[in-house]
A protein has these predicted regions:
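Charged, amphipathic alpha-helical coiled-coil/dimerization segments
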Residues: 4, 8, 34, 84-142
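Residues within helix-turn-helix
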Residues: 65-66, 77, 84, 104
C-alpha cells in the first residue's frame, strides 16, 4: 500500500505515476532554468526577481504594474517592492498612466536598457545551450507546443 492519500480522481497507478513524474520534471526544469538566470543576475549585482522584471520590461516595454506582476509571476506587493529597489538603483522608473490616476506604468531607464541588453542574451544563451545539448530542434519545437497546450496557450 502506498503512503499517500488517494485523491478523488480515480487514476490508475500508471497514470498517477506519469502525472507525478511530469510534475516533478517540470519543477526540476523550472529550478534549473531559474538558477541559470539567477547566476547571470547575481553576476550583475541583481536578485533573480529583479532580473525577471528587467527582462519583462525589456521585452514588452512600458507596462502597468498589474501586468508586470502577472508576467513575472510575482505577487503585486512583491512586484511593488522589487520595482522600488530597481527604481532606487536607477534601472526603472514609474509613471502615472495618462488614462487613469490609479494605473502606474513601469519602464526601463537608459541604464536599465543597458543591463537588459547585457544580461538577456547571456540568459537566453545559457538556457538554449542547456536545452540544445539534450534535445534536437524538433524535440524543442515539440516541447514548446506541448508546454503551450499544457498551460492553455495552444500552439506557440
Amino acid at each position: 500500500m502506498k503512503n499517500y492519500v488517494k485523491t478523488k480522481a480515480s487514476l490508475s497507478e500508471r497514470d498517477e505515476a506519469i502525472c507525478v513524474d511530469i510534475f516533478r520534471n517540470i519543477m526540476r526544469a523550472r529550478h534549473l532554468l531559474r538558477s541559470k538566470a539567477s547566476n547571470v543576475a547575481e553576476s550583475n549585482g541583481l536578485h533573480a526577481a529583479e532580473m525577471n522584471v528587467i527582462d519583462i520590461l525589456g521585452k514588452f516595454g512600458p507596462i502597468s504594474m498589474g501586468r508586470l506582476a502577472a508576467e513575472t509571476f510575482i505577487s503585486p506587493s512583491n512586484t511593488t517592492n522589487t520595482v522600488k529597489k530597481l527604481e532606487r538603483a536607477g534601472l526603472v522608473e514609474r509613471q502615472r498612466s495618462a488614462n487613469s490616476d490609479r494605473e502606474v506604468h513601469v519602464t526601463l531607464t537608459g541604464q536599465g536598457r543597458i543591463v537588459f541588453r547585457k544580461c538577456y542574451p547571456r540568459i537566453l544563451g545559457e538556457v538554449h545551450a542547456h536545452m540544445a545539448e539534450r534535445l534536437t530542434r524538433g524535440e524543442l519545437r515539440q516541447l514548446e507546443i506541448l508546454l503551450g497546450k499544457l498551460v492553455g496557450g495552444g500552439m506557440a
